[in-house]
């Protein structure tokens, strides 16, 4: 399976003690945005002296760091939203950009202990923040979320249940997704979210793959499921429109770097391999 661009590159090694070097790679972040040159390149040649630098690791032999930008973007550079960096950054760097944005935000939002208010300190040997007063330790947040492709029928009669949310483009439809609740299994989350968002029931829930999703700090767990009954009832405020689409007449789909798109592409590829249906 091809790697998602939101993943860490295969040749990246996590290293909290990586030393500085002249060829070091820097992800400079402010409010979830990356500092890029006007040519769309990452900054280089920065000094680490006196800066709240976060060691990420090594990309091959090249040290990689993240650090917050406290002022405005300098001349010849601009702050670019993480989503807008897709296709701009070289291959393999988008996933590290997501890691940098998440860790800078974690450091910013955990400057003080949530239990006693004492200034937090970096953990030793891990990504945690620790309180020197009461001993509280907190780690970078990862919010698990399920995403599921619901289908019915076989061969050329296969249909997918797709929806459009209030924050999506009006002509783009995607698969259903939602966060996992405390004490809930992933499979139970699939059944609950399907019932809440579109009002139908499903069966044959099967795990497919996962994808890190740094918007802002999710891990997508992808599933497929078969329709088991019920009428579509869109959840008010969460789902603008939901309907069945035949595989020969699909709407505009999400970008290729999303878990939703991979679920759909994999399902279509399976239909092609079955030999009884050709998709274009």
Swiss-Prot record:
Substrate binds at residues 83, 139, 211-218. The keyword NAD applies. SUPFAM superfamilies: Nudix. Keywords: Hydrolase, Magnesium, Manganese, Metal-binding, NAD, Zinc. Divalent metal cations. Mg(2+) or Mn(2+). InterPro entries: NAD-cap_RNA_hydrolase_NudC, NADH_PPase-like_N, NudC-like_C, NUDIX_hydrolase-like_dom_sf, NUDIX_hydrolase_CS, NUDIX_hydrolase_dom, RNA_Hydrolase_NudC, Znr_NADH_PPase. A divalent metal cation 1 binds at residues 177, 197, 238. Zn(2+) binds at residues 113, 116, 131, 134. It catalyses: a 5'-end NAD(+)-phospho-ribonucleoside in mRNA + H2O = a 5'-end phospho-adenosine-phospho-ribonucleoside in mRNA + beta-nicotinamide D-ribonucleotide + 2 H(+); NAD(+) + H2O = beta-nicotinamide D-ribonucleotide + AMP + 2 H(+); NADH + H2O = reduced beta-nicotinamide D-ribonucleotide + AMP + 2 H(+). A motif (Nudix box) lies at residues 178-199. Pfam families: NUDIX (PF00293), NUDIX-like (PF09296), Zn_ribbon_NUD (PF09297). Its EC number is 3.6.1.-, 3.6.1.22. The keyword Ribosomal protein does not apply. A divalent metal cation 3 binds at residues 193, 197, 238. A divalent metal cation 2 binds at residue 193. mRNA decapping enzyme that specifically removes the nicotinamide adenine dinucleotide (NAD) cap from a subset of mRNAs by hydrolyzing the diphosphate linkage to produce nicotinamide mononucleotide (NMN) and 5' monophosphate mRNA. The NAD-cap is present at the 5'-end of some mRNAs and stabilizes RNA against 5'-processing. Has preference for mRNAs with a 5'-end purine. Catalyzes the hydrolysis of a broad range of dinucleotide pyrophosphates. This is NAD-capped RNA hydrolase NudC. It comes from Deinococcus radiodurans (strain ATCC 13939 / DSM 20539 / JCM 16871 / CCUG 27074 / LMG 4051 / NBRC 15346 / NCIMB 9279 / VKM B-1422 / R1).
